[in-house]
């Protein structure tokens, strides 16, 4: 059995892994794990990833979890352009720096924006208070400013003149609040231009394919009560 990727494109790290593999012509079998149906919580999936999270990778008898680890594994196993994860010590360190920063900052803010603005009221039927939503969106705005000031600055991409894993991970995160109807790029011309560069670099068709699900988040039907009961503890733990 060749490379298998366990993904749901509703998930932002899954989108990053999917885009990277497709863009670099890495052959893989796609194994869909439907988060909305709670398939990631099943005993069957726990055999692949006991943490019950996506993405997950299976390469023969070898399994791997965590999106950054998976992306790095793919850069090392397959012949991909150097700019994704440069050999140059300091250029690579810049990518590492962003990947270390984003997990508890941009990811948290973008995830909370999606769930508080759309997924709780629409999918789970549990509206959040206006105060909570306002605080979530304010936190997102602060994080976006940090992204611009610390990482993008006046560069073409987050870590230099070429796209890297940092940009791919960042853009897939930012499309979460976009899917919730947040005007993430409005009033931020540098960030908006950067998005256009990233989209062009990965290919517009692939970019749209990967984000088709999240851009329809507002149209999700209400969750079945049984699914809601199963998912709620997982959701609350995820966005806390």
Curated annotation (Swiss-Prot):
Expressing tissues: Found in erythrocyte. Expressed at low levels in liver. In lung, expressed at low levels in club cells and ciliated cells at the alveolar/bronchiolar junction. Absent from epithelial cells of larger bronchioles.
Gene Ontology BP terms: glutathione metabolic process
Catalytic activity as recorded in UniProt: RX + glutathione = an S-substituted glutathione + a halide anion + H(+)
The keyword Isomerase appears for this protein: no
List of residues binding glutathione: 40, 53-54, 66-67
UniProt cross-references to InterPro entries, sorted A to Z: Glutathione-S-Trfase_C-like (IPR010987), Glutathione-S-Trfase_C_sf (IPR036282), Glutathione_S-Trfase (IPR040079), Glutathione_S-Trfase_N (IPR004045), GST_C (IPR004046), GST_C_Theta (IPR040077), GST_N_Theta (IPR040075), GST_Theta (IPR051369)
Residue span(s) of domain GST N-terminal: 2-82
TM spans (from-to): none
Keywords: Cytoplasm, Transferase
GO CC annotation, single: cytosol
Major site of localization recorded for this protein: cytoplasm
UniProt-listed Enzyme Commission number(s): 2.5.1.18
Domain of life: Eukaryota
Domain GST C-terminal: 88-220
Subunit structure: Homodimer.
Function comment: Conjugation of reduced glutathione to a wide number of exogenous and endogenous hydrophobic electrophiles. Acts on 1,2-epoxy-3-(4-nitrophenoxy)propane, phenethylisothiocyanate 4-nitrobenzyl chloride and 4-nitrophenethyl bromide. Displays glutathione peroxidase activity with cumene hydroperoxide.
Annotated protein name in UniProt: Glutathione S-transferase theta-1
Organism: Homo sapiens
């Amino acid at each position: 059995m060749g490379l298998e990727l366990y993904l749901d494109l509703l998930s932002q790290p899954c989108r990053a892994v999917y885009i990277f593999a497709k863009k670099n012509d890495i052959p893989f079998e796609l194994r869909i794990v439907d988060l909305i149906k709670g398939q990631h919580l099943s005993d069957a999936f726990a055999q692949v990833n006991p943490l019950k999270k996506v993405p997950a990778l299976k390469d023969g008898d070898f399994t791997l979890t965590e999106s950054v680890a998976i992306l790095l594994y793919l850069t090392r196993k397959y012949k991909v352009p150097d700019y994704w994860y440069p050999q140059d010590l300091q250029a690579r360190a810049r990518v590492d720096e962003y990947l270390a920063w984003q997990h508890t900052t941009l990811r948290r803010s973008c995830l909370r924006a999606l769930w508080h603005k759309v997924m709780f009221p629409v999918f789970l039927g549990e509206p959040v208070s206006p105060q909570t939503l306002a605080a979530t969106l304010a936190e997102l705005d602060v994080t976006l400013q940090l992204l611009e000031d610390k990482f993008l600055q006046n560069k073409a991409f987050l870590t230099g003149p070429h796209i890297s894993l940092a940009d791919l991970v960042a853009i897939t995160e930012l499309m979460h609040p976009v899917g919730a109807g947040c005007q993430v790029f409005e009033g931020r011309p540098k960030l908006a231009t950067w998005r256009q560069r990233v989209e062009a670099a990965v290919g517009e068709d692939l970019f749209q394919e990967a984000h088709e699900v999240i851009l329809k988040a507002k149209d999700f039907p209400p969750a079945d009560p049984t699914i809601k009961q199963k998912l709620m503890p997982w959701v609350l733990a995820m966005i806390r």
